[in-house]
């Protein structure tokens, strides 16, 4: 703010009312509003990368309103940026203190007050309560709600420590290797020792060496360990609870330097606070990346659309969540290169991913290095996914969004931000897409949205990485990842990968719709290309995906690059499918299938599935050069999964009824046409006129044409083109691509079957064994490429197989149905990875004898499909049997449970009766005793009265009163 004002101090004596504000030129409040509205971003930009808010709380402190403490006046109001969030500060007792309540409600809003309080106590941070006057100042400054009754204020250093303990990386401070703190405690007789940070790797680590007996203790135990020296006096430790060592252990050197005492504070803050929910944001971006360094950045990139690299600042500002400012700064810091390729890192967390990303954008790397997570604005799902190795967790939902990323929320950021950053970003993306860092430039010529593989892909993928860095990184990561992990959506295949096609009828229907959708998508793609990724619904996926999906899985990662390739929106916008948004594929796979028939509105469909679809189908088709291959490659995976059904529908517009034939025969021509238009390499597809393709341009085509159409399905045509480019396209996939290419030629019906089997085990969906699955799958797919349906079918099968576990969208029955239709769909759009492989092969073949090959493929596919159908029927029966046995077991259990409950009720009744009887008896006994007591009491009373009251008789009486003393 100070910077904003250009004044060294934006000190507002809020009491002075507004005048003082106006004195500052930009009122404090006004400035604050400005910051809130995005001024921060501007600010950070001005500050320069170094200062961005992002790098660390410290780097932010520069936003402090005042310069020196000497200038601090009592109750002077200022604003400090903590982790990029403006926090109101007040000078109390000559010290600038921040409003803890405001910090809790902004930076730490994901934590409960309890957690925050406990952590604060554990860190030994004391809160200063403000006076009513100060509270009023804070209210007027907007830090506290009007209804607040009290507010604790902590120093900036304490606020940084508190936030760092929640949001910061869990890393020990950088200290010399053999460094040790000389510590003492005064519990009981007291003791002193050396606290060795290097040994402090868990809360119970024996890291303190006693200075007297040289034994090692954990901090918790050390405070209970004391040596009675002659001059020691016994002190009863107060509150020696599990957290107390931080209070009792002190540096023996009272005059330690600030640096040392801060390091000590940081060390004490480690392993504090029980379960530490790291902010997702950090993880999201960073986690994926290298977890810390590029963590924040990655997240920024992902969330902010990476800020689109250079354009990040402006771009980000628009849609970004709170962390936007950081992100922005970060990205900017990262420099146009693009944030670290969160994409790569995120995607695989491979070494390449981690370092590659940074590499691509040196600055990106730097920015990425931000250790502190950007404000954890992103959705909760983020971090986790990005952090997890995707392979292990196939996405439970069909769509990445499942993660709770709020696609809508981030969409603009992801989609818009990245695309906007498109050019810069784009170029990077292009590079990645192309399969080379060099690809960047090529990509850059593409429309911003599409151009950047990342940009385009990002649209859908939610800006994977930020810009060039991302692409380059993506490419590298993709390549690395590809080798390591197949490009298939294996990681989150379950969700989207299962391309549960809609029912056959629906498919044909959907196909028509798909065609329309494809057209819409194409338009969207064009828009996206123009730089309006948002429009594409891909953006939605992107948003969720961008942050989530991309990081989510290598497959996403691969996809990203592929998408990027495929994303060359250089293709005519209409033709160019939307940048393939890999994420959508994932989610789309099942979703599209299920709902395709339902969505009649082409535009809506395009928006909903188009992006994904296009991402799949179009992605590959779109990517004209190698990039396309790459994109297609990945896309196909997803395509095959999500797009497959969708695309198949789309292409099937013509051949709705017979997906197989249509896919390869009918679709082919269209696809070819569209593809050719879309990509120079698409000639093989060449069959269809743009018209059909346009409808679903690449999307439709891809979806429609197994391989022939766009890459979605077979990517056949496209993949073929890719054959040449596959290396580039597949660079991300590297070996896989090569293998695929090789295999593609090999593709044979058996492959399809094999592919199926493989898939069943892991399948792209399988995820856990992506590499293994991938190769075989790819192989099979390649072979099945020959059999258009084969591969698709195989892919289908796998997804199907996995479907039960992975696909949330379909019931087992549904699954079976989908599987049944799947083969058809698959044939229609064999976009599965296999598809891509076989697609390339098929495409290659198609180039020469598209129709002939297609016929063969059709026949083969049919056999394969029949096999698959039988397998599916068996599987279905098996599933039904299992379901029946489960049902029976459940019913038995219920009966047992009921019997048990009845028994319990009876026993309770008995117990109750028994207790009631006992109570009655007790009552009676008590009553009897009371009666007896009463009688005794009366008798006594009577007796004593007689004794004490002598009778005075008149007249002669034999009674003689006792002699009283």
From Swiss-Prot:
GO molecular function, one term: DNA-binding transcription factor activity, RNA polymerase II-specific
SUPFAM superfamilies: Putative DNA-binding domain, SAND domain-like
Compositional bias segments (type: Basic and acidic residues): 800-823
Record-linked Pfam families: c-SKI_SMAD_bind, Ski_Sno_DHD
GO biological process: negative regulation of BMP signaling pathway; negative regulation of transcription by RNA polymerase II; regulation of DNA-templated transcription
Tissues where the protein occurs: Present specifically in cerebellar Purkinje cells (at protein level).
Residue ranges the record marks as coiled coil: 858-922
Subunit structure: Interacts with LBX1. Interacts with SMAD1, SMAD2 and SMAD3.
Family of the protein in this entry: Belongs to the SKI family.
Protein name: SKI family transcriptional corepressor 1
């Amino acid at each position: 703010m100070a910077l904003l004002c250009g004044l060294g101090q934006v000190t507002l004596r809020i009491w002075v009312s507004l005048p003082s504000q106006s004195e500052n030129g930009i009122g404090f409040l006004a400035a604050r509003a400005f910051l809130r509205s995005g001024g921060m971003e501007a600010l950070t930009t001005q500050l320069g990368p170094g200062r961005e808010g992002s790098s660390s709380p410290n780097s932010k402190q520069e936003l402090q309103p005042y310069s020196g403490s000497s200038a601090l006046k009592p109750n002077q109001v200022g604003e400090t940026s903590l982790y990029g969030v403006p926090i109101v500060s007040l000078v109390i007792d000559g010290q600038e203190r921040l409003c803890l309540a405001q910090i809790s409600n902004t930076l730490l809003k994901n934590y409960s007050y309890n957690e925050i309080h406990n952590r604060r106590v554990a860190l030994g941070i004391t809160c200063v309560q403000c006076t009513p006057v100060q509270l009023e100042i804070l209210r007027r400054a907007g830090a506290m709600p009007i209804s607040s009754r009290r507010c604790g204020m902590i120093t900036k250093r304490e606020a940084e420590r508190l936030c760092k303990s929640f949001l910061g990386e869990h890393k020990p401070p950088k200290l010399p290797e053999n460094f040790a703190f000389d510590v003492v405690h005064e519990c009981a007789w007291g003791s002193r020792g050396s606290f060795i940070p290097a040994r402090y790797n868990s809360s119970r680590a024996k890291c303190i060496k006693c200075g007297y007996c040289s034994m090692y203790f954990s901090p918790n135990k050390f405070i209970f360990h004391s040596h009675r020296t002659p001059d020691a006096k016994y002190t009863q430790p107060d509150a020696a609870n599990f957290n107390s060592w931080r209070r009792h252990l002190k540096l023996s050197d009272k005059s330690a330097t600030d640096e040392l005492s801060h390091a000590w504070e940081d060390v004490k803050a480690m392993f504090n606070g029980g379960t530490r929910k790291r902010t997702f944001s950090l993880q999201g971006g960073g986690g994926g990346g290298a977890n810390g360094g590029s963590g924040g950045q990655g997240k920024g990139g992902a969330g902010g659309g990476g800020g689109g690299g250079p354009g990040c600042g402006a771009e980000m500002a628009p849609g970004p969540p709170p962390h936007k400012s950081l992100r922005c700064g970060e990205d900017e810091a990262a420099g146009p290169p693009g944030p670290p390729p969160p994409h790569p890192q995120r995607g695989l967390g491979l070494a390449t991913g981690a370092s590659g990303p940074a590499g691509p954008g040196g600055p990106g790397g730097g920015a990425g290095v931000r250790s502190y997570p950007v404000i954890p604005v992103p959705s909760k799902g983020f971090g986790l996914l990005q952090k997890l190795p995707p392979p292990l967790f196939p996405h439970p939902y069909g769509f990445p969004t499942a993660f709770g990323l709020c696609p809508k929320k981030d969409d603009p950021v992801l989609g818009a931000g990245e695309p906007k950053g498109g050019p810069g970003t784009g170029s990077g993306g292009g590079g990645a897409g192309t399969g080379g860092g060099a690809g960047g430039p090529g990509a850059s010529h593409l429309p911003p949205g599409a151009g950047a593989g990342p940009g385009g892909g990002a649209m859908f993928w939610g800006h994977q990485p930020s810009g060039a860095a991302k692409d380059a990184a993506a490419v590298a990561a993709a390549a690395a990842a590809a080798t390591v992990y197949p490009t298939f959506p294996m990681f989150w295949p379950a969700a989207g990968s299962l391309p549960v096609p809609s029912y056959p009828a629906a498919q044909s229907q959907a196909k028509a719709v798909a065609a329309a959708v494809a057209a819409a998508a194409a338009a969207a793609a064009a828009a996206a290309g123009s730089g309006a990724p948002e429009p594409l619904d891909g953006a939605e996926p992107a948003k969720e995906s961008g942050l989530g999906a991309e990081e989510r899985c290598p497959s996403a990662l691969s996809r990203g690059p592929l998408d990027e390739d495929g994303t060359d929106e250089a293709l005519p916008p209409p033709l160019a499918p939307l940048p393939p948004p890999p994420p959508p594929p994932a989610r789309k796979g099942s979703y599209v299938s299920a709902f395709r028939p339902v969505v009649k509105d082409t535009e809506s469909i395009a928006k909903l599935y188009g992006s994904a679809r296009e991402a799949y189908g179009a992605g590959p088709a779109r990517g004209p050069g190698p990039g396309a291959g790459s994109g297609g490659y990945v896309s196909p995976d997803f395509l095959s999964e999500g797009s497959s059904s969708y695309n198949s529908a789309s292409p099937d517009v013509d051949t709705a009824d017979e997906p197989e034939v249509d896919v390869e025969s009918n679709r082919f021509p269209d696809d070819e046409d569209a593809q050719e238009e879309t990509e120079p390499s698409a000639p093989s597809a060449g069959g269809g006129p743009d018209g059909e393709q346009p409808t679903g341009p690449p999307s439709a085509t891809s979806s429609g044409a197994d391989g022939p159409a766009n890459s979605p399905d077979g990517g056949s045509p496209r993949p073929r083109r890719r054959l040449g480019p596959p290396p580039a396209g597949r660079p991300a996939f590297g070996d896989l691509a090569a293998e695929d290419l090789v295999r593609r030629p090999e593709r044979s019906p058996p492959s399809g079957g094999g592919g199926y089997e493989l898939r069943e085990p892991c399948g792209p969906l399988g995820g856990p064994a992506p590499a293994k699955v991938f190769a075989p799958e790819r192989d099979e797919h390649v072979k099945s490429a020959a059999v258009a349906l084969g591969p698709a079918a195989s892919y289908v099968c796998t997804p199907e197989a996995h479907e039960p576990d992975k696909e949330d969208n379909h019931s087992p029955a549904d699954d079976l149905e989908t599987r049944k239709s799947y083969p058809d769909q698959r044939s229609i759009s064999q976009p599965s990875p296999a598809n891509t492989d076989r697609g390339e092969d098929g495409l290659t073949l198609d180039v020469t004898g598209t129709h002939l090959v297609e016929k063969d493929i059709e026949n083969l596919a049919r056999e394969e499909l029949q096999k698959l159908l039988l397998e599916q029927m068996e599987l279905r029966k098996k599933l039904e049997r299992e379901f029946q046995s489960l049902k029976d077991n459940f019913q038995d259990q219920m009966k047992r449970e009921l019997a048990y409950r009845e028994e319990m009720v009876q026993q309770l009744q008995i117990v109750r009766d028994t207790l009631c009887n006992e109570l009655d008896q007790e009552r009676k006994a008590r009553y009897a005793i009371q009666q007896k007591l009463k009688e005794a009491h009366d008798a006594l009373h009577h007796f004593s009265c007689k004794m004490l009251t002598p009778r005075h008789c008149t007249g002669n009486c034999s009674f003689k009163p006792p002699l009283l003393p």
